[in-house]
């Protein structure tokens, strides 16, 4: 904001919301009866990840860590889809949990997802940080360009014209595959 003013956030946040809704729609249509899929829109990490933290604080007594999973879908607008294994600028948080294991397995063993890579995200964190720190299995998906950056993030060109529908569709398919493997 300080350098460029407000941006449209088509890539950052818009693609994540679209992917989350498309993923949930698919899962709701064909879901085991003992499973529940909910979509939580936290207000984005730009708000200090307070939405995710507040939701967790309000619901932590209802969460069974053995059967509660969080999939965060951030900027999936262009470039190559990645699953995040580490985050943090000053301190590192390792995401070592069941969802990351599933993402790693899918990217290595399922030919549809061989292009999906792991990522150590060194600039700040994602909404998943609160869940991971609480011992809840959490996975973040994001897309990165050839320089390891999230395309158009917080820039004036963060517009619908810079969204690659193929990248968004890949994120939807990968998210569904992660969830279905978890449910199997």
Which residue stretches match the model-derived regions?
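Active-site-adjacent substrate-binding region
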Residues: 76-184
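Acidic/histidine-rich catalytic neighborhood of metal-dependent amide-processing enzymes
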Residues: 2-95, 102, 113, 124-127
